[in-house]
Swiss-Prot record:
Molecular function via GO: nucleotide binding; RNA binding; RNA-directed RNA polymerase activity
Transmembrane segments: none
GO terms for biological process, alphabetical: DNA-templated transcription; symbiont-mediated suppression of host gene expression; symbiont-mediated suppression of host mRNA transcription via inhibition of RNA polymerase II activity; viral RNA genome replication; viral transcription
EC number: 2.7.7.48
Family, per entry: Belongs to the influenza viruses polymerase PB1 family.
Its job: RNA-dependent RNA polymerase which is responsible for replication and transcription of virus RNA segments. The transcription of viral mRNAs occurs by a unique mechanism called cap-snatching. 5' methylated caps of cellular mRNAs are cleaved after 10-13 nucleotides by PA. In turn, these short capped RNAs are used as primers by PB1 for transcription of viral mRNAs. During virus replication, PB1 initiates RNA synthesis and copy vRNA into complementary RNA (cRNA) which in turn serves as a template for the production of more vRNAs.
Pfam families (UniProt xref): Flu_PB1
Catalysis performed (reactions): RNA(n) + a ribonucleoside 5'-triphosphate = RNA(n+1) + diphosphate
Biased segments, Polar residues type: 55-64
Listed GO CC annotations: host cell cytoplasm; host cell nucleus
Post-translational changes noted in the entry: Phosphorylated by host PRKCA.
Name by which UniProt lists this protein: RNA-directed RNA polymerase catalytic subunit
Length: 757
């Protein structure tokens, strides 16, 4: 059907149409090839912003380092990282003065966190740089490998299971003269196949020991691996993001815990809250500025943009902030928190995979690894790449680039927000000591600034003063990209404010549709997304009804499960028609079995199986929800599952949906091609790790999950738990005497085997 698009906007206020200008339909752009070029860009830019700083050499690694702190005063308009320590400290002092006790209280909260956090906190997160294999791995595997290497090198504090003890091992590892690691490699052999008598290549996976001297180990411990950020909309160029190794992660976690605790107490901070809570917080600040700007005052708002926030931040500034925030705290606590910024001041950026070359004439392709960039003849490269490599060469060591200034994306979001808020805090009249004053909102690098003054000159003066104050702490407001409006209309973190926040519905568009997990989860996620958008994003009833119909249509096409009485022919239609004809109560069939859709906007909160249960034929119920059915996944399904949905900005977010285990909740198997590569050993480790954890969870269901205290191993904990549970079950008559005896016998056998081992 052809719709004249202008008709859609006849009754819509202009600000609500903002959503249609966002680049959020269709697939987002992904990067291909290596991120080496983007990483070199980042390293070179970061050094350029700080180029008038002082050069020094790291005595341990020999890496050249640039320190712009307390260097020349920053210049107007040019982004720079020349923060002044005394200015940062003063901003911190004023922040504390206007929020008495804020640092003290946050330190106490964080001390508790430090003492209670378990090392498994580090298993959260996806890809992590694994220094033992010098490449990325899932976080849990990278942690397991690190701990394994630590143990084989005599570092065992981590066995207590506390994160702080693992960090003690990290500190000790840096003092060791050498570290021995195990690496995976693969051998290829040509052998004759007995069956076919042909020559085939046989691959075997080996593990070999390798010694790293102190310098090599330090370089690896301080390395951030880099990748290209994928799926970034509305940008022409890709950019690099970093993933740190396990040595850095734990320290960063504690610093961010402290900063998060501070942010929670600051009304101008857009972190760590999100969604509606964030909107309410922001609306409060705006309301305050508007009510306080009496009829005599003007109020203007800047929708702010900072130039290269991360690349102008400096870990040395963060160290100064932490030193100030923790100044009255115990020595051990101050030390733990100061390590992350110190490590970041000495960080190395891994350049990624290197460059791919192809020769059209000779039909050759070859990879130039990053390690070779320091020595290779530059005549093979085009001009722009040649310039990049020339610039970065003095910084290269073993395929990594020394990167002392700058912060890499997303590492200290909370702490950098504290810095931003401290400048917003200086806008109070008691600090500006003049007729203009300001307030605003800060969320990582995004900000909105509200300036009040009696006249336009005052507004201009206020903006100028804010701009210059920011410069002194290494924040560069972009004059080109920021714009100013009468207060009441602005944008902050993709929320659009026009006398209240307007729903920016296009942000949610990518999460509509079929997720592709399995038939059961997809149906549940699809209707939950529609329900959530009715609650949070002004999705009206008529549009929601239409979204629902489109979703069902999309779902049927994805899983080829058109209604049993349809004319559409697909690979499944023969089976589905047969089921349709055999079924007495056709309304009871799930949509994925060719049944009708019973959802409307009033019952989106009910899982489909529950919605149709009373309508189902008995034998259909039996097949659908029979735990002995081989097609039912035997994973115990929690009543609530988490799906990852892709909103348009920010990281993928986790969304809860109701899960009912049926024959449709299958879990696809892993791709087999990985099993023939050097990854195989790693994969087996990972599966074993997974199995142990799953088994452990069986013994300690989350409701009663108190970790075994003391030094007991996982096995001991499970055995003692099994005995307790068995006794309770036996005494309450849930199990027979024979079963009880058998359980006790198994427990004793396990203990006996452990003793023999």
């Amino acid at each position: 059907m052809d719709v004249n698009p202008t008709l859609l906007f006849l009754k819509v206020p202009a600000q609500n149409a903002i959503s249609t200008t966002f680049p959020y339909t269709g697939d987002p752009p992904y990067s291909h090839g290596t991120g080496t070029g983007y990483t070199m860009d980042t390293v070179n830019r970061t050094h350029q912003y700080s180029e008038r700083g002082k050069w020094t050499t790291n005595t341990e690694t020999g890496a050249p380092q640039l320190n712009p702190i307390d260097g020349p005063l920053p210049e107007d308009n040019e982004p720079s990282g020349y923060a002044q320590t005394d200015c940062v400290l003063e901003a911190m002092a004023f922040l504390e003065e206007s929020h008495p006790g804020i640092f003290e209280n946050s330190c106490l909260e964080t001390m508790e966190v430090v003492q209670q956090t378990r090392v498994d906190k580090l298993t959260q997160g996806r890809q992590t740089y694994d220094w033992t294999l010098n490449r990325n791995q899932p976080a849990a595997t990278a942690l397991a490998n690190t701990i394994e290497v630590f143990r084989s090198n005599g570092l065992t504090a981590n066995e207590s299971g506390r994160l702080i003890d693992f960090l003690k091992d990290v500190m000790e590892s840096m003092d060791k003269e050498e570290m021995e690691i195990t690496t995976h490699f693969q051998r290829k052999r040509r052998v004759r196949d007995n069956m076919t008598k042909r020559m085939v290549t046989q691959r075997t996976i080996g593990k070999k020991k390798q010694r790293l001297n102190k310098r090599s180990y330090l370089i690896r411990a301080l390395t951030l691996n880099t990748m290209t950020k994928d799926a970034e909309r509305g940008k022409l160029k890709r950019r690099a993001i970093a993933t740190p190794g396990m040595q850095i992660r734990g320290f960063v976690y504690f610093v961010e815990a402290l900063a998060r605790s501070i942010c929670e107490k600051l009304e101008q901070s857009g972190l760590p809250v999100g969604g509606n809570e964030k909107k309410a917080k922001l609306a409060n600040v705006v309301r305050k500025m508007m009510t306080n700007s009496q009829d005599t005052e003007l109020s203007f708002t800047i929708t702010g943009d900072n130039t290269k926030w991360n690349e102008n931040q400096n870990p040395r500034m963060f160290l100064a902030m932490i030193t100030y925030i923790t100044r009255n705290q115990p020595e051990w606590f101050r030390n733990v928190l100061s390590i992350a910024p110190i490590m970041f001041s000495n960080k190395m950026a891994r350049l990624g995979k290197g460059y791919m070359f192809e020769s059209k004439s000779m039909k050759l392709r070859t990879q130039i690894p990053a390690e070779m960039l320091a020595t290779i003849d530059l005549k093979y490269f085009n001009d722009s790449t040649r310039k990049k490599i020339e610039k970065i060469r003095p910084l290269l060591i073993d395929g990594t680039a020394s990167l002392s200034p700058g912060m890499m994306m997303g590492m200290f979001n909370m702490l950098s927000t504290v810095l931003g808020v401290s400048i917003l805090n200086l806008g109070q009249k008691r600090y500006t000591k003049t007729t203009y004053w300001w307030d605003g909102l800060q969320s990582s690098d995004d900000f909105a600034l509200i300036v009040n003054a009696p006249n336009h000159e005052g507004i201009q003066a206020g903006v100028d003063r804010f701009y210059r104050t920011c410069k002194l702490v290494g924040i560069n407001m972009s004059k080109k990209k920021s714009y100013i409006n009468r207060t009441g209309t602005f944008e902050f973190t993709s929320f659009f404010y026009r006398y209240g926040f307007v729903a920016n519905f296009s942000m949610e568009l990518p999460s509509f549709g079929v997720s592709g997990i399995n038939e059961s989860a997809d149906m549940s996620i699809g209707v939950t997304v529609i329900k959530n958008n009715m609650i949070n994003n002004d999705l009206g009833p008529a549009t929601a009804q239409m979204a629902l119909q489109l979703f069902i249509k999309d779902y049927r096409y994805t899983y080829r499960c058109h209604r049993g009485d349809t004319q559409i022919q697909t690979r499944r239609s023969f089976e589905i028609k047969k089921l349709w004809e055999q079924t007495r109560s056709k309304a009871g069939l799930l949509v994925s079995d060719g049944g009708p859709n019973l959802y409307n906007i009033r019952n989106l909160h009910i899982p489909e199986v529950c919605l149709k249960w009373e309508l189902m034929d008995e034998d259909y119920q039996g097949r659908l929800c029979n735990p002995l059915n081989p097609f039912v996944s035997h994973k115990e399904i929690e009543s609530v599952n988490n799906a990852v949905v892709m909103p348009a900005h920010g990281p993928a977010k986790s969304m809860e949906y109701d899960a009912v285990a049926t024959t449709h909740s299958w879990i696809p198997k892993r791709n087999r091609s990985i099993l023939n590569t050097s990854q195989r050993g790693i994969l087996e480790d990972e599966q074993m790790y997974q199995k142990c954890c799953n088994l452990f969870e069986k013994f300690f269901p989350s409701s009663s999950y108190r970790r075994p205290v003391g030094i007991s191993s996982m096995v001991e904990a499970m055995v003692s738990r099994a005995r307790i549970d068995a006794r309770i079950d036996f005494e309450s008559g849930r199990i027979k005497k024979e079963e009880f005896a058998e359980i006790m016998k198994i427990c004793s056998t396990i203990e006996e085997l452990r003793r023999q081992k």
